[in-house]
From Swiss-Prot:
Record flagged with keyword Transcription: no
InterPro entries the UniProt entry points to: Ribosomal_bL33, Ribosomal_bL33_CS, Ribosomal_bL33_sf, Ribosomal_zn-bd
Gene Ontology MF, one: structural constituent of ribosome
UniProt source species: Adiantum capillus-veneris (Maidenhair fern)
Cellular location(s): Plastid, Chloroplast
GO terms of biological process kind: translation
Family: Belongs to the bacterial ribosomal protein bL33 family.
GO cellular component terms attached to this protein's record: chloroplast; ribonucleoprotein complex; ribosome
Name of the molecule in the record: Large ribosomal subunit protein bL33c
HAMAP family, per database record: Ribosomal_bL33 (MF_00294)
Length: 66
């Protein structure tokens, strides 16, 4: 059986540009990616450059709070 305290967890990455535009009311949506990370190797929040299909460019995506 699978261990409940598994080192790998599923996380969501959200576009930081869309979050900033969302507060001003001009956002067409919010770009989210899902991925898995190992908590033992990467204990800090994950930040990656990913393509945002709402901004139409590569932007910084940060791990969201759950």
């Amino acid at each position: 059986m699978a261990n409940t305290k598994d080192a790998r967890v599923t996380i969501a990455l959200e576009c930081t540009s869309c979050i900033q535009r969302k507060t001003s009311g001009k956002s067409a949506g919010l770009c989210r990616y899902t991925t898995r990370k190992n908590r033992r190797n990467t204990p800090a929040r994950l930040e990656l450059e990913k393509y945002c299909f709402h901004c139409h460019k590569h932007t910084l995506h940060k791990e969201s709070k759950k």
